[in-house]
Amino acid sequence: MFKRLIGIAALALSFTALAQPQPTVVDLPTRPGVTQRMLVITPPEPKAAVVLLAGGHGGLQIFPNGSFKWGEGNFLVRSRQLFADKGLMTVVVDAPSDRQRAPFLHGFRQTAEHVTDLQATIAWLKTTAKVPVWLVGTSRGTQS
């Protein structure tokens, strides 16, 4: 009987894992010759979208498989699935392709180019999900 209960519990957990939306990596053209890499988690029927802006230097260096070279411990980055679990399309943005080396976003967050990159991200979300878009930043991410 106990083995059967364990089997049922394991099966239920596997279905729960399958039900979670899988993250995808999107490279969005934002400026001539520049792309914005984003990790996107899209739940079924999102209520809104959140753009998560990590603090620090902002160079997450998201790999094509969705892993990070830096920032995995950042509060927003590590909480990304919690946002998606609440029905929010969740987007973790990296530094753009022309800022993938130190100093990454240092001194860049206040520029017109950064605004252009974020505007392109917001426009893509509004077109893709057709939901309200919220920007969420911590520490230096709030400068964006």
Locate the predicted segments by residue:
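Bacterial N-terminal signal peptides that target proteins for export
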Residues: 1-7
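N-terminal signal peptide c-region/cleavage motif recognized by signal peptidases
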Residues: 14-16
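N-terminal cap/lid segment of alpha/beta-hydrolase-fold proteins
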Residues: 20-45
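Short, surface-exposed "cap/lid" segments of acyl-processing enzymes
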Residues: 43-88
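Cap/lid segment of the alpha/beta-hydrolase catalytic domain
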Residues: 61-72, 92-112
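Alpha/beta-hydrolase active-site loop
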Residues: 75, 101-128
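Residue in the alpha/beta-hydrolase core beta-strand immediately N-terminal to the catalytic nucleophile
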Residues: 132-134
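Gly/Ala-rich beta-loop-alpha elbow adjacent to hydrolase catalytic centers
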Residues: 136-142
